[in-house]
């Protein structure tokens, strides 16, 4: 046979032109949530003002204090803020709003 075909195998490899870079797991940070007491013991407060911002019930609502859906404590009436310890071993804290008459 005059026409003989030779099959040749060409091995072609492409190498990276740029170095591959892995990702890092750092580089994120959340904003501070500004939790904690907004009114101290003995301070005057108006209806609707926030007394304590919290996650979970670290401080429990007392008289004239409401509990929001995010566990925020707020005043239900005007008056003075009063923190009290209660429970066995006085291990829990309750905040109340005591009605206060101003001397005119």
UniProtKB/Swiss-Prot annotation:
<dbReference type="GO" id="GO:0022625">
    <property type="term" value="C:cytosolic large ribosomal subunit"/>
</dbReference>
<protein>
    <recommendedName>
        <fullName>Large ribosomal subunit protein bL27</fullName>
    </recommendedName>
</protein>
<keyword id="KW-0689">Ribosomal protein</keyword>
<dbReference type="InterPro" id="IPR001684">
    <property type="entry name" value="Ribosomal_bL27"/>
</dbReference>
<dbReference type="InterPro" id="IPR018261">
    <property type="entry name" value="Ribosomal_bL27_CS"/>
</dbReference>
<comment type="similarity">
    <text>Belongs to the bacterial ribosomal protein bL27 family.</text>
</comment>
<dbReference type="Pfam" id="PF01016">
    <property type="entry name" value="Ribosomal_L27"/>
</dbReference>
<dbReference type="GO" id="GO:0003735">
    <property type="term" value="F:structural constituent of ribosome"/>
</dbReference>
<keyword id="KW-0687">Ribonucleoprotein</keyword>
<dbReference type="GO" id="GO:0006412">
    <property type="term" value="P:translation"/>
</dbReference>
<feature type="propeptide">
    <location>
        <begin position="1"/>
        <end position="15"/>
    </location>
</feature>
